[in-house]
């Protein structure tokens, strides 16, 4: 729907709300989904290789661990809902993932030499991700930023795989 715009710019029409939602889902949301989950896979894989299978307990800040445990408890207390995943990393927000990478950048640097640039790029999509995640309309510049980070992250994953870095799903 190339002509779809933010429904809030028009007189209320439920069809415009649906069209805007479909547009965001088809053009933006799936890329954010991929970005966040590719970061999870890379972080898990690299930290498992560098620290070991118990990397979460060793390499993650206790404050992040506590936040994740609260989020996990929310799902445990409502078993009629699905859960984000088995590993704690699936309960971590994008901002948490960035903090984990920052705190362990020395472990990422041998595999991803420009890790500091990647941390900055993740920060560039954090707020646009929240806009989309909270069901709002992203600005054109934010959509373009998401497009570029998604494409570049796909390339990084391919480079890691080609270099022999084992990538595994947490």
Region locations from a protein language model:
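Amphipathic alpha-helical interface elements
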Residues: 1-170
């Amino acid at each position: 729907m190339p002509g779809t715009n933010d429904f809030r710019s028009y007189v209320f029409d439920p069809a415009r709300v649906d069209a805007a939602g479909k547009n965001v889902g088809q053009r933006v949301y799936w890329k954010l989904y991929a970005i966040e989950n590719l970061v999870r896979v890379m972080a898990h894989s690299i930290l498992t290789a560098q620290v070991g299978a118990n990397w979460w307990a060793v390499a993650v800040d206790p404050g992040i661990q506590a936040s994740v445990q609260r989020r996990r408890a929310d799902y445990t207390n409502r078993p009629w809902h699905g859960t984000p995943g088995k590993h704690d990393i699936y309960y971590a927000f994008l901002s948490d993932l960035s903090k984990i990478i920052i705190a362990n950048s020395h472990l990422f640097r041998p595999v991803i030499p420009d890790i500091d640039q990647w941390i900055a790029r993740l920060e560039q999509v954090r707020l646009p991700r929240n806009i989309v995640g909270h069901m709002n309309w992203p600005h054109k510049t934010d959509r373009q930023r998401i497009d570029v980070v998604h494409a570049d992250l796909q390339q990084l994953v391919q480079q890691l795989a080609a270099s022999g870095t084992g990538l595994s799903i947490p």
